[in-house]
């Protein structure tokens, strides 16, 4: 298997959610990553959107790097079909390795774990710990309440507009993914067909 052109870390739910569009979008993300020569980095789970995005990447011939804490492996939540499956001791180890292996980050719909991972890489970016692009897939308005809240935080002057500018949002994964890869400075021979 050839070296990947880029590596994108995807955060998403370990459940499928209540809207079939969530699963469809996770599948599109996985297929797009593989079809464009990329590598998926994710939390190593086999359930929910996590399993769907990994399975779609693998089915399309792509590489998948899973990173999962030992405690979750012991609960039999690990996706054993990953190209690489790294079993780490703690959640902190997991998040660090995922961030190190990524050129860009994308948050799909998910729960508190997805939110926490998204906020952490966003915090690291605003502190200058990395300069990797961060995307938020606002599928069917899933993240609208959070974006309203964040804009109120800006109004209350606990966040600056420049911090909001550090995240890219779109409701369409197939529009957001090429922008993230381009912003990461990775090879983008596919951009003319995607944007």
Give the positions of each predicted feature.
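A cross-family phosphate/adenosyl-ligand binding-site feature
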Residues: 1-101, 139-174, 178-179, 183-195
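Arginine/glycine-rich "motif VI" loop of SF2 helicases in the C-terminal RecA-like domain
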Residues: 58, 124-132, 158-160
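Flexible, glycine/proline-enriched loop segments at strand-loop-helix junctions
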Residues: 108-109, 133-137, 164-167
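Glycine-rich phosphate/nucleotide-binding loop
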Residues: 108, 129-132, 140-145
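Active-site/ligand-binding-proximal alpha/beta "capping" segment
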Residues: 93-128, 135, 186-193
């Amino acid at each position: 298997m050839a070296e990947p052109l880029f590596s994108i870390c995807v955060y998403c739910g370990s459940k499928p959610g209540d809207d079939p569009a969530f699963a469809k979008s996770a599948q599109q993300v996985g297929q797009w990553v593989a079809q464009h020569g990329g590598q998926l980095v994710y939390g190593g789970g086999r359930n929910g959107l996590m399993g769907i995005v990994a399975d779609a990447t693998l089915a399309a011939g792509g590489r998948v790097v899973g990173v999962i804490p030992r405690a979750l492996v012991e609960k039999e939540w690990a996706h054993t079909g990953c190209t690489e499956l790294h079993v780490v001791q703690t959640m902190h180890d997991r998040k660090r390795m995922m961030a190190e292996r990524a050129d860009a980050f994308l948050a799909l719909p998910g729960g508190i774990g997805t939110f926490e991972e998204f906020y952490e890489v966003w915090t690291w970016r605003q502190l200058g710990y990395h300069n990797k692009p961060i995307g938020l897939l606002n599928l069917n308005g899933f993240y609208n309440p959070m974006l309203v809240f964040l804009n109120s935080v800006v109004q209350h002057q606990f966040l600056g507009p420049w911090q909001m500018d550090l995240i890219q949002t779109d409701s369409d994964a197939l529009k957001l993914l090429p922008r993230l890869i381009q912003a990461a400075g990775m090879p983008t021979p596919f951009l003319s067909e995607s944007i």
